[in-house]
C-alpha cells in the first residue's frame, strides 16, 4: 500500500513535468522549433484538425519553419490558421509551401517570455504540491484505517516529501535551461 501511494504520486508528478516541458516548448526563443505549431488548428472539412496531421513541418534553416501540406488544396486554410494563431509570425505562401521566418527577439520580448515562463513554472509547482497533498491525505487515511503503522506513516510522508522535492528541483532545472535559452542572443 505504501509503495503504491509513492509510485502513484511519482507518476502524477512526472505527468505534470511532461506538461511543463510541452508548455515551455511553445515559448519561442528566436530559433525555429516545430513544436511552435503544435497548438495550431486548421479547419479541415468543417472540423478543427491539428496542423501536424495535415502537413509536414520542417526546419530548412535555423530561423525558418517550412509547412508542406499533404493536400495542396488546403494551403489557404493553413495560411489563414497561421495568421489567426497567437504566434506573431507572418506566413509567406509561395503556392506549394508556407514559410515562417522566426524574427529575432527584442530584449523586451525576451523579458516578457521569461515572465510567461514563470507562470508555467509556478502552475507546475502548484500541481506538484497538490499531488503531494493528495498522497499525504491518502497515507493518513491508510494509517487511520490501520493499514499502516504510525512509524510507517512518518516514513511514507518523508518519502513523499523527497519525491516532491525532486520534482520541484526538476521544474527549477527546466526553468533555468529555458531562461538561459530565452535570454541568450
From Swiss-Prot:
Q: Name one GO molecular function term.
A: ribosomal large subunit binding
The keyword Protein biosynthesis appears for this protein: yes
InterPro entries reported in the protein's UniProt record: Ribosome_recyc_fac, Ribosome_recyc_fac_dom, RRF_sf
Where is this gene product found?
Cytoplasm
In terms of CDD domains, this protein maps to:
RRF (cd00520)
Q: Which UniProt keywords apply?
A: Cytoplasm, Protein biosynthesis
Predominant cellular place of this UniProt entry's protein: cytoplasm
Q: Name one GO cellular component term.
A: cytoplasm
- Please give a single GO biological process term from the UniProt record: translational termination
**Main role?**
Responsible for the release of ribosomes from messenger RNA at the termination of protein biosynthesis. May increase the efficiency of translation by recycling ribosomes from one round of translation to another.
Give the family per the record.
Belongs to the RRF family.
Spell out the protein name for this chain: Ribosome-recycling factor
Q: Which organism is it from?
A: Lactococcus lactis subsp. cremoris (strain SK11)
Amino acid at each position: 500500500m505504501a509503495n503504491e501511494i509513492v509510485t502513484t504520486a511519482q507518476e502524477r508528478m512526472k505527468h505534470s513535468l511532461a506538461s511543463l516541458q510541452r508548455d515551455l516548448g511553445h515559448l519561442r526563443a528566436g530559433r525555429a522549433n516545430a513544436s511552435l505549431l503544435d497548438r495550431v488548428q486548421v479547419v479541415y472539412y468543417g472540423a478543427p484538425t491539428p496542423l501536424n496531421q495535415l502537413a509536414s513541418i520542417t526546419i530548412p534553416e535555423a530561423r525558418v519553419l517550412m509547412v508542406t501540406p499533404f493536400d495542396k488544396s488546403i494551403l489557404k486554410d493553413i495560411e489563414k490558421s497561421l495568421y489567426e494563431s497567437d504566434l506573431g509570425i507572418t506566413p509567406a505562401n509561395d503556392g506549394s509551401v508556407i514559410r515562417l521566418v522566426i524574427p529575432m527577439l527584442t530584449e523586451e520580448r525576451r523579458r516578457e517570455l521569461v515572465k510567461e515562463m514563470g507562470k508555467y513554472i509556478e502552475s507546475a509547482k502548484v500541481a506538484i504540491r497538490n499531488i503531494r497533498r493528495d498522497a499525504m491525505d491518502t497515507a493518513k487515511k491508510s494509517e487511520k484505517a490501520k493499514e499502516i503503522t504510525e512509524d510507517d506513516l512518518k516514513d511514507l510522508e518523508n518519502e513523499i516529501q523527497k519525491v516532491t522535492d525532486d520534482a520541484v528541483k526538476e521544474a527549477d532545472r527546466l526553468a533555468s535551461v529555458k531562461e538561459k535559452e530565452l535570454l541568450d542572443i
